[in-house]
């Protein structure tokens, strides 16, 4: 009879061991969750910064590729040719609403990263060029292609030097923004991995630094291109062409650059701050303190 009771108690002991194991496992998970709370919140903030940077970079990339209300207001710079002063004009021209229209040109041209849009002051944008990864805006070619036969415009001699610099800078800027967008997408996905160990902060931080660098350089190039182009054209009053800067585009570029810089600084800090899961398991650095504070609570 006693033997029967002893055998009956064996399953009870196994059940108790399983329940004890579950409790220990739950306590371990709770301790890890409490100990890494600051790091998890910080990673969430970093991921949010990358998401915002991606949104702004997408807006930068798709600006002025179509005539939609939002996209048509995003451009690097805009040329106003409505009061352009021709050097000569063919006889028999019928006077239009603007000098540019009379000469066969459009009143304005606004430039994005992939394409440009053109239109008239009384009609708005009438056409946007086909998006092209190799695009760069050559105003001389566009004006000469659209100018009516017999008409001519006195373009400044230094415009060719400016255009050569513009072409190189334009391609670099485009590549940097596109590369930054791809890197930000990768970082948005892999950033949570730094929760497990501080060592992951090194490769992720390096990738974050590269992303921040290319986006900041792209923003600098975009700003410099816009201001140089505006200064070059507005310094020629005899030409009658006015250039303006797209404040939305510049703002989006620097917003993306700012969020990338903040994300990089936080990633750099995660290499030496905020307890990781590995710290808790090994009892290293802040992990030992987190274990001591977590044990009484459990």
Regions found by a protein language model. Name each.
Residues 73-85, 207, 211, 279-289:
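Cytosolic juxtamembrane regulatory segments of membrane proteins
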Residues 33-69, 75, 173-229, 253-256, ...:
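Signature of small four-pass
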Residues 1-40, 274-298:
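Intrinsically disordered, low-complexity terminal tails of fungal membrane proteins
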């Amino acid at each position: 009879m006693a033997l029967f009771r002893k055998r009956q108690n064996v399953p009870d002991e196994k059940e108790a061991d399983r329940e004890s194991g579950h409790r220990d496992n739950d306590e371990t998970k709770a301790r890890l969750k409490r100990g890494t709370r600051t790091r998890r919140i910080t990673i969430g903030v970093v991921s949010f910064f990358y998401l915002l940077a991606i949104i702004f970079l997408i807006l930068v990339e798709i600006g002025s590729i179509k005539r939609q209300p939002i996209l048509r207001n995003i451009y690097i710079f805009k040329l106003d040719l409505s009061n352009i002063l021709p050097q000569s004009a063919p006889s028999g021209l019928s006077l239009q609403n603007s000098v540019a229209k009379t000469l066969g040109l459009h009143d304005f041209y606004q430039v994005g990263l992939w394409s440009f849009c053109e239109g008239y002051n009384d009609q708005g944008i009438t056409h946007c060029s086909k998006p092209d990864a190799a695009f760069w805006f050559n105003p001389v070619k566009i004006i000469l292609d659209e100018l009516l036969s017999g008409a001519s415009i006195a373009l400044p001699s230094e415009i060719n030097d400016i255009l050569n610099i513009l072409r190189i800078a334009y391609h670099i800027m485009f590549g940097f923004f596109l590369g930054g967008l791809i890197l930000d997408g990768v970082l948005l996905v892999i950033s949570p991995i730094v929760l497990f160990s501080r060592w992951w902060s090194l490769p992720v931080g390096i990738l974050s630094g590269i992303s921040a660098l290319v986006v900041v350089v792209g923003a600098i190039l975009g700003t410099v291109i816009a201001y140089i182009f505006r200064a070059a054209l507005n310094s020629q009053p005899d030409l009658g062409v006015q250039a303006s800067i797209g404040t939305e585009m510049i703002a989006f570029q620097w917003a993306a650059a700012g969020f990338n810089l903040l994300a990089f600084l936080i990633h750099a800090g995660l290499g030496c701050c905020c307890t990781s899961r590995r710290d808790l398991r090994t009892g290293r650095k802040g992990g030992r303190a987190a274990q001591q504070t977590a044990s009484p609570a459990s």
